[in-house]
Amino acid sequence: MGKDQELLEAARTGNVALVEKLLSGRKGGILGGGSGPLPLSNLLSIWRGPNVNCTDSSGYTALHHAALNGHKDIVLKLLQYEASTNVADNKGYFPIHLAAWKGDVEIVKILIHHGPSHSRVNEQNNENETALHCAAQYGHSEVVAVLLEELTDPTIRNSKLETPLDLAALYGRLRVVKMIISAHPNLMSCNTRKHTPLHLAARNGHKAVVQVLLEAGMDVSCQTEKGSALHEAALFGKVDVVRVLLETGIDANIKDSLGRTVLDILKEHPSQKSLQIATLLQEYLEGVGRSTVLEEPVQEDATQETHISSPVESPSQKTKSETVTGELSKLLDEIKLCQEKDYSFEDLCHTISDHYLDNLSKISEEELGKNGSQSVRTSSTINLSPGEVEEEDDDENTCGPSGLWEALTPCNGCRNLGFPMLAQESYPKKRNYTMEIVPSASLDTFPSENENFLCDLMDTAVTKKPCSLEIARAPSPRTDNASEVAVTTPGTSNHRNSSTGPTPDCSPPSPDTALKNIVKVIRPQPKQRTSIVSSLDFHRMNHNQEYFEINTSTGCTSFTASPPASPPTSSVGTTEVKNEGTNHTDDLSRQDDNDPPKEYDPGQFAGLLHGSSPACESPENPFHLYGKREQCEKGQDEVSLANSPLPFKQSPIENNSEPLVKKIKPKVVSRTIFHKKSNQLENHTIVGTRSTRSGSRNGDQWVMNAGGFVERACTLGRIRSLPKALIDMHLSKSVSKSDSDLIAYPSNEKTSRVNWSESSTAEHSSKGNSERTPSFTSEWEEIDKIMSSIDVGINNELKEMNGETTRPRCPVQTVGQWLESIGLPQYENHLMANGFDNVQFMGSNVMEDQDLLEIGILNSGHRQRILQAIQLLPKMRPIGHDGYHPTSVAEWLDSIELGDYTKAFLINGYTSMDLLKKIWEVELINVLKINLIGHRKRILASLGDRLHDDPPQKPPRSITLREPSGNHTPPQLSPSLSQSTYTTGGSLDVPHIIMQGDARRRRNENYFDDIPRSKLERQMAQTGDWGEPSITLRPPNEATASTPVQYWQHHPEKLIFQSCDYKAFYLGSMLIKELRGTESTQDACAKMRANCQKSTEQMKKVPTIILSVSYKGVKFIDATNKNIIAEHEIRNISCAAQDPEDLSTFAYITKDLKSNHHYCHVFTAFDVNLAYEIILTLGQAFEVAYQLALQARKGGHSSTLPESFENKPSKPIPKPRVSIRKSVDLLHASHTGQEPSERHTEEALRKF
């Protein structure tokens, strides 16, 4: 790479030594002092050194990279060498924007004060945002304080008309809101018609921010086109904010721009929240100061409870309901009526404007812990550093770069709609979730007439949106019962109030850096998804209850009846799911609401193991148990199903995903406790039970995932899939014959065959079991057959697995965790940025000491420690070592987790594994453009000992194709230089290696099927319109020995009757004073590239042209207006070659007959393949013209000769001095005289 690129990479990775080395030549003449003349060596180093303000493709300078990645020392070093702080990237971001976005207060101070270049604090990006916007949005209060001290203008609005105060209020940055209000209280009155800080805070439920704004003097009744802040809070279900606004004295009769009051809004969105808000408005209008229907303060216990008083059971509330206004009564009735109907998630979303959806992303505190009949609490399973957790007040939460996973939510608009049963599951698919359902004992819910429609509405919502919704809260119809859902999400910070603000809707400014950071965060997470929280149907009944327990920790399932723990009117139903000893998820399933309620004897456990729907794939949850507890006969106290595996039936697989196989850890404890009424049917869903068996080999466990996945999770090592035969067998056996989701449990006379371990399982009887009905008998026979088939296949595979050679495996961990374990966490960026981003592919056969040195780890002691730790990592096993032979390139790349390169391999002709086994590293660099050394080493290690052709030898220096002489003899190739002149010892010839690889790819029989050609040419080739070629062409390797290619690109008639058109960038032309063949093209390419790289303005001026190649020559066509600019006849083209430094750049030399000068024209193609095809097509055009000349002369029809081959005296061009890769030397004789087609060639090109 060039020095500019080295400087950018060093600044990004934090390599201070390399930055100092690259910029050291400037010292002394720029800032080093001294008034004497500069030494010549210093002048030369300045000339050759990198540009300190050079940019990459995204417009980032080295200072951008250093500021974004927090490299303080490099920022100081760059400023010392006069790096400019006021250069914007392609999106208009200045370095101070990135430092403020990152929250690095030290770098912000350096950029402002250090100099010699000082940042201007009010600079705006393309979105009109200042650095204060970035800091305020992400809650970086220290940076905000610095910027306010530097007199940053807080009244500047971005393209969405948002001030920094608006952003801080929108995202709940309480501390920032207080700071800005304190510094500029006049902002309270600077509002637009679209929004105010109060509206934005109310919309997202930031209660504390709303209170601060009101205390600071903001008008509570200020209005926008959306109405008052009460409209916003009511629309999004923010009950706490509604209460605060009402207590402050807001006018509830204000109308929005559409003439709607708050009550009208609630009518349009019937939900549990709407019911609560309507009741609150009722009390407010009646003069009640404090609500009795909202939740009580959070208990000190870890479980947050919601208390809702029942208006029916409370005499005082009965009195109030009788005196309610007619409008409110009508509203409440309409809400209840609408809830009985099928209201889907889409119906609710369609009424919300796009502006709201763009700004909402995270679950607010009402959704997480304070409102509704259930609460959700978020806790962290990953220890975050202190810098990643910002200690804020009630509504504060960390966002921005320290929590990059938050920015990955696929939808920022649907997370927080304020409706009680809907919250989008929008976390990345590689995250773990642990759901815990704990119904509380002392919660009062709404009256009995509300019981059924709440559950029906919840089931309808789940059914209509299974793929993107997570049922976060299920309202409980029981008067003495309610549920609570606890969500554990890795990667989230643990706050006191468990609330999270919405994720900002702007992506990180740096695409390259953000991608690397995101990969670093996501990569270590297991590949699994979450399921959907099932609905819990608790019916309000005053009957005795019995409690049953399912214990699966020892491989058995038992139901034990026990006396009720409390009187029937206040008895507690607790459903609890816990995971002990494992990090896997117990997913929660839902019961299909199309199942008709049926009654069965209690001995027939009505449970069925279903596959999760394709919309909520849950690879880690093997079983979903749907339980329906029936009326129990008197005197029946215990149902025991110990050591009897639960039956399961596989749902038809509706997706095409290939099943995987994993093992899970042993000793997984799942415990489910539920209560049972003695004389009333109740529906429960038993959630997250994982069946485990004792006695399996090596303590491993095979689990069938019901969504079409057989998975195997192990404590050590990588996940590998089972043979395809086993998977095919599993798929073929996955059938479902019953339309019902209920199935009877097998009787005690039937031996269960669901035995996943080698030891047999004892049969246990079930008291009171009745005979199975005939309809279930046939189903169980089918299930027994399925279990037998799967059991045989799994046991056979276990034997094969146990027969393999065992070896140490490393725990699945990130590169950062691995470096932390060896005490060198500072090198994480070095490894990640250079492709060493997966511990599973960093064994001793992948990483070497030289690699560590190249990526900037200069400390020899640290390198030695890393190399010692690498010895403990597993070596990469080459393909074929353990019987694994990938059948396709895509499969092989996926196996080494480099699937992103699949397209690059295929479009460059590497379409089979046989071709890959002969690939060289230089091809990975120059052809495939794989710049990360870690990825290259991983690829080569995976390929193992590859089959190369014979050691490449350098080709002859030049081959001259001459025109026929006067005696009409065929042209002769010039004598080749002796091969003994070039030895293969010491180094390989890189150009020839690449040409060999290209020849291998083009020998592939299907290669030409993939070659992009013109539409007309493809049609004519398919229909045979070309017919047999009228002339016979010599293959390229016979026409010139400088290329080993054996096939031309096009049909000869294509170049005779039509032309081959290619689009490219024209970099310019250079006068050739001394014609030296490919050396001249090489010099011209280097000069033209250097001119274009000097400035971005120069690059913007590079025109796009179309090269139209035929046997007559090359036409320059303006790609914009399709005008012909100039023509170069084939006889005047001397040499065509690719640039060895950049294979996408090529050039050819032509002679201007008017001035008798030679010019080299330089182009850049869109990719390497296109450049090579253009060069080869030029060679084919000459061959076609030459063969036509031969045919004409043999037939004596001199008049039909192409004008390029009329008999004229000729003299050969001197041989080029060096060889060049993939070049076609079209060295012709020069002719005197001027043809009409050449009269304005060079003049037109120079003007162009």
UniProtKB/Swiss-Prot annotation:
One of the entry's Gene Ontology molecular-function terms is: ephrin receptor binding
Q: Where does it sit, as one GO cellular component term?
A: plasma membrane
Keywords on this record?
ANK repeat, Cell projection, Cytoplasm, Nucleus, Phosphoprotein, Repeat, Synapse
Q: Where is the composition biased (Polar residues)?
A: 305-322, 371-384, 753-763
Each ANK repeat, start to end: 2-31, 58-87, 91-120, 127-156, 160-189, 193-222, 225-254
Q: Which residues form the PID domain?
A: 1056-1213
Q: In this chain, where does the modification Phosphothreonine occur?
A: 503, 773
Residue ranges occupied by any SAM domain in the UniProt entry:
810-876, 884-949
Q: What are the Basic and acidic residues biased-composition ranges?
A: 577-601, 1236-1248
Listed transmembrane segments: none
Q: Which PANTHER family match?
A: ANKYRIN REPEAT AND STERILE ALPHA MOTIF DOMAIN-CONTAINING PROTEIN 1, ANKYRIN REPEAT AND STERILE ALPHA MOTIF DOMAIN-CONTAINING PROTEIN 1B
Q: What is the name of this protein? A: Ankyrin repeat and sterile alpha motif domain-containing protein 1B
